[in-house]
Amino acid sequence: MDSNKVIVMDNGTGFVKCGFAGANFPTAIFPSMVGRPILRSEEKVENVEIKDIMVGDEAAKLRSMLQITYPLENGIIRNWDDITHVWDYALKEKLKVSDPTECKILLTEPPMNPVANRQKMIECMFEKYGFQAVYVAIQAVLTLYAQGLLTGVVVDSGDGVTHIIPVYEGYSIPHLTRRLDVAGRDVTRYLIKLLLLRGYAFNRTADFETIRQIKEKLCYVAYDVQQEMKLASETTVLVENYTLPDGRVIKVGQERFQASEALFNPSLVDVEGGGVHEQLFDCITKADRDLQQGFYQHIVLSGGSSMYPGLPSRLEKEIRSLYLERVLKGNKEGLAKFKCRIEDPPRRKHMVFLGGAVLADLTKDRDDFWITKAEYMEKGFGALDKLTKLSV
């Protein structure tokens, strides 16, 4: 089958990444949002026609005039009407798919996705769009494929949720999977709060996009927070100027590392539970002893919120210190034997899509892999049993 008849769709809380099998990069990346006009007074704004339903880039452009909704929350589809608008936009506007009945589609899902959700995704693909065949893959497993691995722990931090997922021989391990409800969106909100405390005036919704851009350009993870605080209070080396769209110039200093600290200390954004390092350590130490070494040596970062400079080294430092304290009980000599490696692939922002594109390309002609329309018509949701076995 022709690769451009095999679609790969990675639905994230913040962004949809979509394209074709075998691609090195998504064809389109757009915000996972739907907007409806608050007032129907004008037909066009900035050359964009105002429609009853606006999706993706178009909705983002006119967000101040729209009632915005996000179909996914914490990685899981919550609004089915809206997600079909998002899929319509992706297939028709972005990928220019004229006839889905000639195509196959690989969708991604978060770990611990409710079974009813998976069923509804498949039902929609066959009954609304009429695809020939469908496959649903767990995002973390795709990340490892993109990295050329079958076993490892994926720390996947996107816009709406951070997951820590151990994968062994291509199978994710649900009972060891950890979910942390702190991700990109929370760091952006926290950065707004920190800048408001500094006396800068922002509108929390309209300026959200601007602050997200500041975060992506200037924020980093401190290796040693105390050291950075000392630097920030005694010098101006950390201060960077940023010009806002309205021409104002703001100075961003210690907020550059304070915002991302929410990943390590969720209480900063009023979320209970341990930080990403504690959840990662907990996930590995609760695994079978034989698997732990392989997990420590293959910790793979994935998702847009793993892009902060300094994150890999800080995470490694925190894991080593937890290992020293809780496993070695303070015996520093044992630390020399402890091997921990954090892999931070340069293209990790789109790792899930890349893994999906590799998998879809390898399997595009294998009927034993995909759920076909005929199987779905015959067995209904029973056809989903195929997905529990993943052999590549």
From Swiss-Prot:
InterPro entries: Actin, Actin/actin-like_CS, ATPase_NBD
Pfam families: Actin
Keywords noted in UniProt: Actin-binding, ATP-binding, Cell projection, Cytoplasm, Cytoskeleton, Nucleotide-binding
Lineage: superkingdom: Eukaryota
Residues bound to ATP: G158, D159, G160, R212, Q213, I214, K215, E216, G303, G304, S305, S306, M307, Y308
Keyword DNA-binding applies: no
GO cellular component: Arp2/3 protein complex; cell cortex; cytosol; polyphosphate kinase complex; pseudopodium
GO biological process, one term: hyperosmotic response
Single GO MF descriptor: actin filament binding
Keyword check for Nucleotide-binding: yes
Location(s) in or outside the cell: Cytoplasm, Cytoskeleton; Cytoplasm, Cytosol; Cytoplasm, Cell cortex; Cell projection, Pseudopodium
Similarity comment text for this entry: Belongs to the actin family. ARP2 subfamily.
Purpose: Functions as ATP-binding component of the Arp2/3 complex which is involved in regulation of actin polymerization and together with an activating nucleation-promoting factor (NPF) mediates the formation of branched actin networks. Seems to contact the pointed end of the daughter actin filament. The Arp2/3 complex is involved in organizing the actin system in cell motility and chemotaxis, in phagocytosis and macropinocytosis, at late steps of endosome processing, and in mitosis.
Complex formation: Component of the Arp2/3 complex composed of arpB/Arp2, arpC/Arp3, arcA/p41-arc, arcB/p34-arc, arcC/p21-arc, arcD/p20-arc and arcE/p16-arc. Interacts with carmil (via the region between the LRR domain and COOH-terminal proline-rich domain); carmil is required for Arp2/3-dependent actin nucleation. Arp2/3 complex, MyoB, MyoC, and the alpha and beta subunits of capping protein all form a larger complex with carmil.
Protein name: Actin-related protein 2
Gene designation per UniProt: arpB
